[in-house]
Structures are given as structure tokens and as C-alpha cells.
């Protein structure tokens, strides 16, 4: 699965130097491989164990030598070993056969489920779609999750930054989005694990199986393909695994003409790996030690994530902010490409409000009247101003109590608490934990529901009726039930 074979006889070279994950290979005159070609080394180490290693050509050094970056460990590699030019970039399997499977950067399955049953492969390096092929009209991507659709709507073919610490519900939110795109949009998802913990990758896989996102009995019914280059792998693998996942997503968009969700966890690790490789190749570092090609590297990945006339790739990227410094070149470069940000707040998770999306910190470029319409825009802004006022009043309530507020402020607090509760909803993928059936809420139902709360039409209903429900009809039914129980 490493590369498509070239038509001429493959050129063979000899390893002349190995420094960590970087190796220099000498080829015969006139037989030098191209930049980004995959080199394959298959040999035995001094202990008699098999070595099978792929490296990507990064530099042509002169004197018939090339410098390549290994995609796996270089343990046991010695000078004099033979390296073969595959004549093509690293290529990975694509199509339906990838669903439910876990791959490494080279497109090799690592889930012990046997070989991948497909002959379709695609190179991980390709150009972004031409301007004439792009869908330029902004279109909202409905997720069925109230808080996202109302306050920070996603753009179809856009890029979303997902911010949140440990244990606030990132994984569950990702699972729900994968589930909803499959059921409501007939789309599939690709998950790229870039430089994160192997344990987290394994946990995610097990949770996907538990929630039905991966069907272990019939993999063809699965809704996601996974591609991992984890923290313990060499920088070459971490730098390229995002492109491997993106290539799988592009096939679903361009060939199957589907809407695809691409998850990248974590986009910062992609930049970090590029920085390591850049230093190993001897390039002069730029600001804060990052690679001088930072903008180019990030742009090459991000520009391929887009809507075309055939389909779309909507990307949700977890963003780690080093030392919480938003001016660090890595997150700052990433922000330039994002259309929306979804911020998960620990305070909301502590209150039991799931999804714990912060309604005041989350933003979207789509939230403007010309895109979402006047009604949606006005409703969203009214919800945010009500919640903002409630936030301002919380200190007064804590010191003096609710009774000291004016009648108008008491009403604002009451409605804000209902809004906060109504922003929660039960998830399909969490049914096994909550015992409540999941809800997909249409955008028009979401807008209508919040308008009714803001207009005071539901002031007489108890606050608890708004918690973990779908639309307003369910609120009313729950209120009746609470009334009967009393």
C-alpha cells in the first residue's frame, strides 16, 4: 500500500548515512528519485530480523544523494543497505473498504482484522481543487445539535476548531457528529489521530464500537475510517498522517460525491512534527523555533479541505494551544484558516449540561444575516445577550440573593436558566449511558424553541422541563409529566 509502481524498472540506491529518522541514500547517476517519492528498504538487520521501512524523499543533496525522512523507526538500519525508489509518493487505500478499519500513515491496517479488500489507492500528495471546481456559496452544515446550529453554525466544507480540556466531552461530541452525518446526510467520516496518545486512540476505537459508529460484525456498515500516527511514532509519520486521512476523505468527496466529516486530533501536533523534521533536515528555524515553511505546510493541508461542486469535506480540528498562548505561531497560523470555533467549557460540564459547548465563547463566520437569515441571526444574538446578562448578574445573586434583583432582571435570569438547560440535548451515541433516546433537532425547530423562551411564552413551565430534551414539544410533554408527578 506504499506506492503505485512506476512503469520503468525501479532505481536502486545505497544507504550512506543514518541520523535518527533521517537517512541519506546514494543513487546511480541519472536515476535520482523525485522529491516526495517513497523509498522502500527491505533487509535484515545484524541480528537477522527483517526490516521493512518506508522513507519520503525531502532533499536532493548533490553527488547523486538524496535525504529522506523515515516513516517508522530506523532501528537496525546500517550503511550499505539497499533502498528502492518506488517511483511514486506514499499511497493509501481509499473507498468503502476503509470504513471501520484503522490504518497507519502508509495505509497499512493496524487493527489485526486482515488485509484491506480494495485495489483503489491514492497518493497522499495532491493539489487543492481548482477555483472553478469550488462551491463558493456559503452553506450552513446542519448538525442536529442545537447549541452548534444556533450559535456557532458550521460551514459546509469549512474548518472548525474544537477547543476543550480533558473530560469535557470532546470525544462524545465527535461521535455524535459522525453518527448524525451518516444518518441525516448519508455521509461518512474519517478520523486522523495526529501525534496524540495511543491509549486515547484505542479508547476512541472501543467507544466507536460500543456506540455503533463502527459495526464490528459487519465493517461495511461502519460510518468512519481511522488513520493514526501517534505520539510514539517518528516525526515523519506524525507529519504525514494528516495527509493520509485527508486523502481517504477526498475519495469519498470526489469519487463517491458524498459529504464527509474529517476529524484531526490534534492539528498542533501536525505543526510540531513539521518543526522536528525541519530541524532534522538542517533548515534555519523561524519564530519560536518553528519551521520557516510553517504557513506553507499548514496551507497545503487546509486548502485541500473544502466544498467542491461534487461534495464537501467539513473538518473539525482539535486545537491544542501551547501554554494557553494564542499568539504562538502554530495556533495563530491555524486560526487564519478556521471558519468557526467550538469551545467546550468545564463549568457547563460540571453543571451536567451536555454538550458542554460555551454559548458565549464559541464563534462562527456563518452567523451573519446574509448567510443564515434575519430570524436565525436575531434569535442567536438575543440568546447570547440574555446569557451575557445572566453572567453579569451572577456575582450579585451570589452576594445578595435572587430576591434583591429587579423584576426585569429576575425574568432575565429565569429565561437564561431555561435557555442554558434547553441548550443541552440527549445524544444518540450516549443512549447506553443516559438511558435516554438521542435527538436530532432541525434548525427551524431550534430557532422556534428559543424564540418562544425569549418571548416569555414558556415562563410558566418549570426549569427542569427544558433539560436534556429535543424540541419544545418535548419540553411541554416533560412539564406535564413533572406536574402529574407532583
Swiss-Prot record:
Binding site for ATP: 164-171
NCBIfam families xref list: atpD
An annotated GO cellular component: plasma membrane-derived thylakoid membrane
Complex and partners: F-type ATPases have 2 components, CF(1) - the catalytic core - and CF(0) - the membrane proton channel. CF(1) has five subunits: alpha(3), beta(3), gamma(1), delta(1), epsilon(1). CF(0) has four main subunits: a(1), b(1), b'(1) and c(9-12).
SMART domains, per the entry: AAA (SM00382)
EC number of this enzyme: 7.1.2.2
Keyword entries, A-Z: ATP synthesis, ATP-binding, CF(1), Hydrogen ion transport, Ion transport, Membrane, Nucleotide-binding, Thylakoid, Translocase, Transport
Keyword Thylakoid attached: yes
Family under the similarity heading: Belongs to the ATPase alpha/beta chains family.
Organism: Prochlorococcus marinus subsp. pastoris (strain CCMP1986 / NIES-2087 / MED4)
One Pfam family recorded for the sequence: ATP-synt_ab_N
GO MF: ATP binding; ATP hydrolysis activity; proton-transporting ATP synthase activity, rotational mechanism
Reaction equations catalysed: ATP + H2O + 4 H(+)(in) = ADP + phosphate + 5 H(+)(out)
Its membrane topology: Peripheral membrane protein
Protein name, UniProt field: ATP synthase subunit beta
UniProt entry tagged with the keyword Ion transport: yes
Role according to the record: Produces ATP from ADP in the presence of a proton gradient across the membrane. The catalytic sites are hosted primarily by the beta subunits.
PANTHER family, per the entry: ATP SYNTHASE, ATP SYNTHASE SUBUNIT BETA, MITOCHONDRIAL
InterPro entries, alphabetized: AAA+_ATPase, ATP-synt_VA_C, ATP_synth_F1_bsu, ATPase_a/bsu_AS, ATPase_alpha/beta_chains, ATPase_F1/V1/A1_a/bsu_N, ATPase_F1/V1/A1_a/bsu_N_sf, ATPase_F1/V1/A1_a/bsu_nucl-bd
Localisation: Cellular thylakoid membrane
Enzyme class, first EC level, given as a word: translocase
Source taxon at top rank: Bacteria
